[in-house]
Amino acid sequence: HPRVRRQRQMCIRDSYYRTRMTHTQAVSQIARGIAEGLKLNLYLTEAIALGHDIGHTPFGHQGERTLNDILRGKFDIIKNIKLFEKTNYFGGFKHNYQSLRVASLLEEEYTEICGMDLSFQTLEGMIKHTKLKKNEFMLEQFTNDNSANEHLHFEQVFCSTLEGQVVAIADEIAQRGHDLDDALSSGAMQFEDFQKYLTVKKMKELADIVNRVNDDIIAMNHNHRRFVDENELRNSRTVSAIVSYFINDVIRYSAVKINKYDYSEFEDNDYRVSKEIISFSETAATLNKYLETIITSKVINSPEVSLFDNNAHTIVKGLFKAYYNNPRLLHKGTQRKLYINLRNVSQNVVDFEYGNYEIIKEEFDLITGYDFNNDSTSELAKEYYEKRCVLVRIICDLSLIHI
């Protein structure tokens, strides 16, 4: 999907970086492997996996954090933002909710309906692949289906399909593999240092896996096998072996839980699961958490990543501020979207393409600058309150496409 193809996820050096597309491909592959091992619906699994990050910002999670901070009033950009926050009207920015918005509202695939016409099972898997922020978002900003709240089952934080739960854990496994690969390939962590981290008792299973990979390469050297880049091969095989370990662990542990699940309860619950069934074993969960801690200290907190995050923050914040302060900078197609969305909340809408320049300027000044501290109850205040909310979401949509 074009929304994920050029979005950098993490940057260590210019010649080595990962994008949302490579991450999505990895999640899809891992999820299919788990789903196949558990005899689940491969089509649903892949649909969720391929769509789970289409609402993500560029610059990895830093882009998401910056937009979230803007919408929650940490910067003086959106006028009267604190009044909006009291009602949780903005709530913040989360890429999983934005994925729902992209799939349900933004994409134009059909003449009859908005969005991509995905099943509720697919949409639920997309929005629940990461943590929810319940009661902080107004769902009508993200879908035009009035029954979405019922069918997305926000009463439980995990997915009501096993396929959705599979994608959530596949995302976790892929992230761990990516981060370890980045750490080793960039030189932020040497292979020997990684081996030392695994000498603690609780990491014995992973240590055995890593040592076997290293022993295999040494054995091939003794057999006069020559490698173009031995370190790169060792790193690649290590990451692959660790990812395979987690995949097999999830399949084995989850299969036991599936077999114990009361099928009559599943039938009575409209073929939805009411428990989190797809998971790591206790041992694998500990190993996963330890790996995350290592990588955070060696990579995420590194000066290179901090510089990248700082630049990302500056770009996202600067663009949002520029578009908010002067919406006429918005692309013609985006102004058309803004016009259409404003028509949904008010009949008093200016044609931004063919309207009078002074009238357009006055309208934008009111949308971005109307002071609700002086007037928060009149019909005019309510109108521009709604219009400002629309503009803010449209700018967030724009950041996903053009940065």
Give a label for each model feature.
Residues L38-T45:
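Glycine-rich phosphate/pyrophosphate-binding loops
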Residues Q25, Q29-R32, E36-G37, I54-N259:
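Sequence-structural signature of the catalytic-core scaffold of metal-dependent phosphohydrolases
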Residues R13-Y17, V27:
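Sequence context of c-type cytochrome heme-c attachment sites
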Residues H23-A26, A312:
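Phosphate/oxyanion-binding active-site loops and adjacent basic polyanion-contact surfaces
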Residues H1-R8, I12, S399-H402:
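Single conserved hydrophobic/aromatic residue that forms the stacking wall/gate
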Residues D215-V390, L400:
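C-terminal subdomains that position terminal phosphate/3'-OH groups for nucleotidyl transfer/ligation
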Residues E46-G51:
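Short alpha-helix carrying the canonical HExxH Zn2+-binding catalytic motif
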